[in-house]
Amino acid sequence: MDKKTWVYIIIAIIIILLLVWYFRNHMSDQKGVNVNNQTYNMLQQQISSLNQQILFLKQQISNLHVPAPTSTVNSLRQTVSDINQQVSTINNQISSLNPYLPRNQQLELASVLSIFNRNALDLNNISRSVINRDINYFNAGQHGSQVPQNSHTVQNPNVADNELNVLQQKVDNLNGVVSNIRQHLAQFGSGIPESFRDEAEKAASYLNDRIDDINKNLPNLVQRLNPNQRNNLNRILSELNNDLSSLKNSLGSAVRNRINSVNIH
């Protein structure tokens, strides 16, 4: 064979190798898409199932008579722990899968996770003083928020958004606990029964732990707020302190733990 024939043969071999490489990569990509779709659909089903568990748990706790029997409280706490374990597992799966999902699926997944988070927040607000255990939240990724946002959330471009959101979430949680306890107290009229004092004691201890956590981290955050933002934050904290003070007066001597206040800077 002459030199020209060898050139054609080499070119043909190169073309064949390129075609083989292309089809192998195409099939691999297609397989990856199928795996991602299967994982995505499985995640959707798992999250939907957890959402149903959340709603059922919320109904159970709403119907409880305080103080609930210890066996009931322990059972509910175990259910919450099981849900949190599943949330943790799914969060890890989302972290691995999310970068490979198309934008529309990322947005859809974030929406589903946000619905769960809102339901979890509602449940936490009514259940905290009963079982003293929180449902964890999903990470909704770059297209969603980890926790439901409140209309009073203070925004500051010079401070990390997650710091402010976490602080606001802590305040919202405290407001939810205070509101729940006051609703129970309203049912008792002028006197607080002995049967409720133990639960009130636990709630007061829980509130103080959360207030101490806020007080510990607040000074560093406040230093980075502008005057207007600081005023807004102080207003929110003042409202919280007023509610805490009112609850403290309502409980009176029913609890040994004195409920603390948030330090306003």
UniProtKB/Swiss-Prot annotation:
One of its GO terms (cellular component) is host cell membrane. It is a single-pass type II membrane protein. The chain crosses the membrane at residues 3-23. It is found in: Host membrane; Virion. Glycans are attached at residues 37, 125. Keywords: Coiled coil, Glycoprotein, Host membrane, Membrane, Signal-anchor, Transmembrane, Transmembrane helix, Virion. Residues 37-94, 158-257 form a coiled coil. It comes from the Viruses. This is Uncharacterized protein R387. It comes from Acanthamoeba polyphaga mimivirus.
